[in-house]
Amino acid sequence: MSTQEIRNDIQGLRSIAVLSVIIFHLNKHWLPGGFVGVDMFFVISGFLITGIILTRKRENNFSLSSFYTSRIKRIVPAYLAMIIVVTLFAAVLFVPKDFDVFGQSVKSALYFNSNTFFARQHDYFGPASHELPLLHTWSLGIEMQFYLLLPALLLFTPRRWLAPSLLMLTAALLAWSEFCLHGENQQRVYFSLLARVPEFLFGSLAALIPRTQVSIRTNNLIAIAGALLIAGSFTFITEGHTFPGLMAIPVCLGTALLLMNRCSPINRILSLRPFVLIGTLSYSLYLWHWPILAGIRYLSSTYELPPLAAVTFIALTGMLGYVSYRWVESPFRRRMSASASYMRLVGILGVTLLTLLAATILSRKLMGPIPDALTRYGIDAELCHSHMIGDCIRGDHTAQRTLLILGDSHAAQLNYFADMVGNAIHTRFRVISSSNCVVIPNFDVDRIAEWGRADCRAQIEEAKKYTATADAIILAGMWQFHTSSTEFLTQLERFLSDASARKQRVLVLAQVPMLATNPLRIQRANHMGLHMTVSMHPEWASANEKIKAIVARHDNATFLDLSGTPVFAHVPMFNGTLIYSDSSHLNEVGSKAYGEVAIP
């Protein structure tokens, strides 16, 4: 392929890729497999870069410095411009704790190491993944990392061994990723460079296959097969599948088949002006669509956007994508000396670093520091939450009577509650909990996030040591998360029956009222002049009713709902003080107030 050749159908393929990603991110129910558009980009990139390197190698004018200069000019300027703007907005809109997480993601993004950062990111109390403005930079990190590998593969492998070597490497890495996906490290595999290398190599192999004369009918059938593989991936692959691994083969093969083909009706359709235009803007559209979505979702604390917000998102994405392409991306891609390019890049990088520093200061200046007691339900180093600390005792340490509190983070928020109640009624409480996990025997651990499973299993085993000897047991949980699992409801019934056989009393606490939006974000937005009101989440009350019905079937169990007490009359405030640390958890102040109303 000539290095000067421009194929409009490839721009059309890019448009399909970016539109599928945007639609999926806007609402994953509209296009369940739309996320594979990223994999299409990887295949296209492998195809084009392989063609460029091999052509220049054949012409004896390949230069590593020129190659990396062109890649940097293509990717970095618009990338840094996006980071600068998003950082300033995050400084204004994000509460300080969330901005700290964002700042860490910026640092990783600047090193093009976002994939590693997000593979390890599981801050239970941080923003949800769909609220992280730079989450999408993981794919750009992988692309830049691949560019460090590909030249070596192509330049130092003998030409006759190149295709077999790449084919064997593709097969080996696909097998490795498929194997790893069936372990408990699926998130790391998803963001792994090694798991994504085969996708680039599908494109590389497509570039290596010599062109042969085939009939028009065969040509068209190949293109149709490619289009069907892509369409099938969009339709039938979902987030629930293990991915990438073998599930990535259909979309990668389909994209490769269309790249190898250029004369079919499908390729001519992809060459139509609307597809070419969107494909030309695809990089900038990809850069901007996700931060806009994440910002809207952060403010609204909801995944699904109402119609007006969706229209706003589409308009802003198109506008900022065009502005980025017209005034940032294009100027840097024009021919200029390497020194001039690097001077501009150094300038933008300097502005980025200064912006991050200024934004960090701005984030804290816009609102005074929030006391720790309002932002957490306890000091992590003092809680037996997801790990054991000492004897886990709260309340009256000298008391003879010991009650065992078990559950997920809604049990962890009861540590100060236990202090208040325990000291008042001369009782010891042992509190054992784990994130997303009600620590009772046979809890369906595989249902929760991968990062929490090992801690969940460990805490269940720890809780077993104290269950039989406890004078009574208190269960607490975020019931709206657990009542969707019939397996959990079955195990809850069994736990209550086993306690009854031991003649052991069990008190099941109702889930505390849940807000639709994080109150700290509401406070921040209102401080910025953005009017936001408090509303309640619709599911917590119905979940309580389901748990209450189960408890009612066991004579040894009691369901206690304190949501009607004065402490919850004006959530998230009580006596003029914030009592929630986020939309569903009480903070230290709230836990103590909750304990006061629970004292007999």
Describe every region a protein language model picked out.
Residues 1-338, 578:
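Membrane-interface helix/loop caps of multi-pass membrane proteins
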